[in-house]
Structures are given as C-alpha cells and as structure tokens.
A protein has these predicted regions:
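Transmembrane helical elements of multi-pass membrane transporters/channels
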Residues: 1-20, 122, 133, 156, ...
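Helix-terminus/linker motif at the lipid-water interface of multi-pass membrane proteins
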Residues: 15-34, 103-110, 166-175, 233-262, ...
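Short runs within selected transmembrane alpha-helices of multi-pass transporters and secretion channels
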Residues: 54, 122-141, 149-157, 178-193, ...
C-alpha cells in the first residue's frame, strides 16, 4: 500500500513530462522534439547527481526514524537541507558556464543547437526548485507518508499542463515555454511539501540548533549519499556517450529515441516505484532489525515487477506504432520505423530492469550504497560499449542494446550482494549511525 501513492506520483510526474513532449512534437515539429530529446542525458547527469545525493542521505533519516531517534532525525533533515542548498547553487553556476561546451561534447547537430541551449539554460536556472520537490518527497516517504507528495504532484501536474498550453500556444515561447512550465510547476510542488512537512512532523521540523552538526555526522551522511550520487552520475556519463552516438544519427533517430524513452519511462514507473518503496521499507525495518519483513517485502516486490515487465513489455511490442504516433503523428514514417526497432529490443528485456530495480532498492535500504555504485560503473561500461562498438556494427539496433546490457550486468551484481546479505542475516552491513 505504501508503494501505490509513489507509483501514482511517478505516473503523474511522467504524465506532464509526456505532455511536454506531445505538445512540442505536435505543435513545434520533430526538430523541436529532437532538440529537447537530444539533451536528456545531460539533464539526467546533473539532476541525477543532485537528487542521488539528497535521496541517498534520506536513507539515514529513514533508519533514524525506524530506530525511534527523533533528535537525530531532525539533525539528519538539517544535513539534507544544507546539501540541497550547496549542491543546487554549485550545479546551477557550473552548468550555465559549461553548457555550450557540454552541448558540443554531445555532438549536437547544428540545426538543433540553439533550441537545445535555450531549453537546458532554463532547466539549470530552475534546478534548485526542481530538486526541492525531490528532497521533500524523499523526507516525507522516509517518515512513511507517500500520499502527501502525491497530492502536491497531482496539483503540479495539472498546473504544468495548463502552463504548457499557455507558454507554448498562447505566448509562443517555443521550447523555453515547455522548460519554464515544468520548472515552475515542480518548484511550487516542492514548496507545498516543505510547508506541510514542517507543520505536521516534529521529526522533520528543524530548528536553528539542528544545523550545528559535527563533521563526523555530516561525513556519515555523505558516506551513504555520495556513492548513490556517483552511481547516478556514472549512469549519466554513460547516457551522454549514448546520446552523442545517437545525435550523430540525425534528427529522426533522436526523435524516435525521445518518443520511445517516454514510453519506456511510463512502463518502468511501477517497477521504479516498487524499488523506491523498497528503499524506505528496507531502511526502516533494517533500523528496527526486522529482517524477516525485509525478506517478505523483497519476495512480493520482485514477483510483482517480473510479472508486470513481461505483460507490459509484450503490449509495447504489439502496439508500438499507435503509441509512438501519439508523440510524432502517423506521418513520420522513418521515426516510427526506428521506434519499432528500439521498442522491440527494450521491451523484450524489461524483466532485466525489474531485477535491477528491486534488488538495488533493497541493497540501498540497508545503507550500503557502494554496491549500487559499482553497478553504475557496469552500466557505464555497457552503454559505452554499445555506443562505440555495437552502433558501428549494427547501427541504430546496436545502439538500442545499450540499456538491456546495462540492466543485465548491474542486476547480477546487486543480486549477488543481496543474497550474501540474506545468507548472513543482514549483518554484513550496518551504518555506524544506528
């Protein structure tokens, strides 16, 4: 039941992202769609680093809450706010300064450069607001409340859709309007969660003295958070190599990937939501030393993810053309052809993603983030291999194998470590904070 609001929230979050894509693709054309899609890996790299760090340290907060240590939970929350402020500022400044060079690294086609630059510039400017929602929703989930983030996200989703139409169709702001709509909607959602959490939960109601923390306390949080941040950054680097190879294949290939990635994200949402729930569920029960509950939760989560991946993967393969046509229209024949190739490969391997998400979530919940980080390295290697080697041999189909290969190898590592933990009654790892 804890997972259901998380799932609904992720669906709504991807819904307004998909609406952005549909409006851009249908009203501004395939070049505009390709411009937005061509920087997806850069957005993941930056946002993944920031949200991975913030999300990682909330694992510690969850363990404090599970252990009933309210004062430490408040101090942990203060650490999260400090990290959010510093990281948001640094990434915004560095991102804006380095943006032209980053787009050149991505092998950005000349006809897409200006739109891609304008879109990403707005995203960098509003990065702090975007991250605020992720931080607050993670804190609320850490305390066991996954419904309130959903409520604010629904409001944000509706607002985002309205602003999309206003900024793009009324004010003719082009792709900048799509970026501004998303930034504004997510920022308001984050502020709403912040106000609610401060008023409702004493464990999250930080005081001035809570910010007076020792270096050791901060270091213990970073020990958990940094590997997750590095893991997402490594994944982002692999995606940038993938994106660079993709951008060299032209606007049709970029548009096909952009449309397919939106579908893929929707399909992965239930599995990802279960994984997010497993992190909190495992962390709280790990803090309370309820290891048998972790095992039961893992079994239910894994079976649910595998069943979903097989059923929905088959549906994606069968209904690929009408689904992709939602984003680009039925007249984009080459985009649809490439989308069929991509979806056939990805959808048939979704069960690998199910294994990865579930096992990785459980491992992260125990406070061990080094294994998921090592899995991130494996994902990087596989994406680079597909981008630099397989794409040269088989073209677009070879490039499409990047994600399945990444899922398989990272899943094997996390599976091995979880079974090691299970065999030793979860005594292989215990954070020094609990």
């Amino acid at each position: 039941m804890f997972m259901l609001p998380i799932l609904a929230g992720n669906v709504f979050q991807q819904l307004y992202s998909a609406v952005d894509t549909i409006i851009v693709g249908r009203t501004l054309g395939s070049d505009a769609l390709a411009s937005v899609g061509s920087i997806g890996s850069l957005q993941f790299l930056v946002f993944g680093f920031c949200s991975g760090l913030a999300g990682g340290v909330t694992v510690v907060t969850s363990q404090f809450i599970g252990a009933g240590k309210t004062e430490n939970a408040r101090r942990s929350t203060a650490v999260i706010y400090m990290i959010w402020a510093v990281v948001s500022l640094l990434c915004t400044v560095v991102g804006i300064v380095c943006l032209p060079g980053l787009l050149h690294i991505l092998n950005m086609p000349e006809n897409l450069f200006q739109r891609a630059y304008a879109y990403q510039l707005v995203c960098f400017i509003g990065l702090g607001g975007q991250l605020l929602y992720n931080v607050e929703s993670s804190l609320l989930r850490a305390i066991g409340n996954s419904k309130v983030p959903l409520i604010f996200l629904i409001i944000s989703s509706v607002l985002n859709i309205i602003l999309d139409f206003v900024f793009i169709l009324v004010f003719h702001m082009d792709v900048v309007g799509a970026a501004a709509a998303t930034i504004l909607a997510q920022s308001l959602s984050g502020v709403g969660c912040l106000i609610y959490s401060f008023r409702k939960y004493p464990q999250l109601r930080v005081r001035k003295e809570d910010f007076k923390i020792s270096f050791a306390f901060l270091a213990d949080h970073l020990r958990v958070g940094l590997p997750l941040s590095i893991q997402d950054s490594i994944t982002g680097v692999g995606m940038m190599v993938f994106q660079s190879a993709l951008n060299g294949m032209g606007a049709d290939a970029i548009a096909a990937y952009t449309a397919c990635s939106k579908l893929e994200t929707f399909v992965e949402m239930p599995m990802y939501s279960i994984a997010v729930a497993m992190v909190t569920f495992t962390a709280q029960n790990f803090g309370a030393k309820q290891y048998q509950r972790i095992r039961k939760g893992m079994k239910v989560s894994l079976l649910s993810c595998l069943f979903f991946s097989v059923v929905v993967g088959g549906l994606i393969i069968v209904f690929c053309k009408p689904l992709v046509s939602i984003f680009v229209g039925s007249g984009a024949a080459e985009v649809i052809r490439l989308s069929r190739i991509y979806n056939s490969i990805e959808a048939s391997c979704l069960w690998c993603a199910a294994l990865l998400f579930t096992y990785r979530g459980a491992v992260q919940g125990t406070g061990n983030t080094k294994i998921p980080m090592m899995g991130g390295f494996l994902e990087l290697l596989m994406r680079v291999f597909a981008a630099l080697c397989l794409s040269r041999i088989w073209g677009f189909p070879g490039l499409a194998m990047a994600y399945p290969l990444a899922w398989i190898f990272a899943a094997l590592l996390n599976m091995w470590y979880y079974r090691k933990l299970d065999k030793n009654d979860f005594q292989c790892t215990r954070t020094s904070l609990i």
